[in-house]
């Protein structure tokens, strides 16, 4: 089934909106639908209302209000996503594609995180890693670009992360000509004679038609090393989103080990010399990345002007700082950590990186990429065991702070251009070293179920759960984990191009999301975040008259799924005013048709 070409309604604009009631990156003009203007004006009030009441224990009754005539966001085709690694030996397992479809997944990020900056699509081998913290992953034999392209086409689409950090020989940085050749292979026309030129190492990257021709060709009887690219697919795949480099801000410019491979400056032979050679080196500076990004974007778009090219940003945590520990300079806007605080952090690093990159590259940036692990001990309170309460609060609390900081950065550094810049979370999940007790695994599913609709409401176009395998989504036997079932619940709530509608809860311990589906039916999601206490949701729905029969889906502590599926069951007695019992640690989706 070919699903890689999505057709969007002309009125849909997938861009991040301000959380504070002003325009951020949403395109609001005379051509914008009235509901979209209303979304921008009303979003802050609705988000603030949900976060207003913060309790640890859910009340016995919670008031839920749904307004079906007030859209609050449209699900972009790329939102429901996972990250796949070239090292994943189970990516090509026969049942993976059906599992992804069952969870509503339409997008798979490739080739992964740090490995992307040593990955070379035309050779399917990494350049020699020279950084100080090797990612220690291999290449599975069935995950080359040709094989992945066939896989991706059956799932839906992808976001590619091209190599910024290293050339094929491992003697210098990634090159725009190689990235342009990758675009040519995936999206090019075999008759296109445009020359791609030579890279800094002298490699000739031929023409657009050369790479597109490889894609359409049959394998040679005697393999010349390129047969893995010959997949007999003459039609371009039409992949839209391309990211230049992975977490480039970790290249050592701000000190540390230089976790991301970036050979724009050579690595020292001795690790102890790393800080001296790389810290504050102009070749690794955010302005240098911004300048190089512009060249990447221009050469890639010269192959296919329809693509969108994005940059990784450090996570802008405005609003997440403990004000007892930090003081903000009213003139510079920089933060100073108080001397009495024992655990020191460089909060300003992310501000400096994002400002430098955006001020240099804004005119070519189509989207920005963030990575978010709300359980990460280096980014939150320092816990090593899962803090379930904090994780379940993150979609309404921490996420709003992150996006508020991002909106601020975009407005300050990109001006009017900020209106058209989209936002992707190309990695999201729970840090792998956080301990998750077996009895608490359900929390990961509730978090995923809550997170994805919230991202849709905020205008985010993509969120890649990390990882497809061994990130809680699937294990190595392809047994689904809690995040998988959480995303199944989102899939029950809505599909891409369905609209979220206004929904509010009187308690922060009961999340609510609602959708108006393509057939006019209501999708209602309720999530009880209390581990011990049940509640009853007193639901009032306006804007359309509902039928008395619907389907109910439950996932949670007392409602374990089948081996692979959260199954729905018929529900009677529904109306525009109804009471829904909610057990502890449970997500419920109710789909109710319009009354006839």
State what each model feature region is.
Residues 31-57, 63-146, 151-174, 181-228, ...:
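N-terminal substrate-binding region of glycoside hydrolase catalytic domains
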Residues 422-513:
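Aromatic/acidic polysaccharide-binding cleft in carbohydrate-active enzymes
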Residues 569-596:
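C-terminal beta-strand-rich structural cap/linker in extracellular carbohydrate-active enzymes
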Residues 76-80, 103-108, 153-159, 237-241, ...:
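Loop/turn elements at helix/coil->beta-strand transitions in domains of secreted/extracellular proteins
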Residues 507-546, 585-591:
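Carbohydrate-binding surface patches
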Residues 186, 203-228, 260, 276-443, ...:
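Noncatalytic carbohydrate-binding groove/subsite architecture in carbohydrate-active enzymes
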Residues 2-12:
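Bacterial N-terminal signal peptides that target proteins for export
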Residues 21-23:
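N-terminal signal peptide c-region/cleavage motif recognized by signal peptidases
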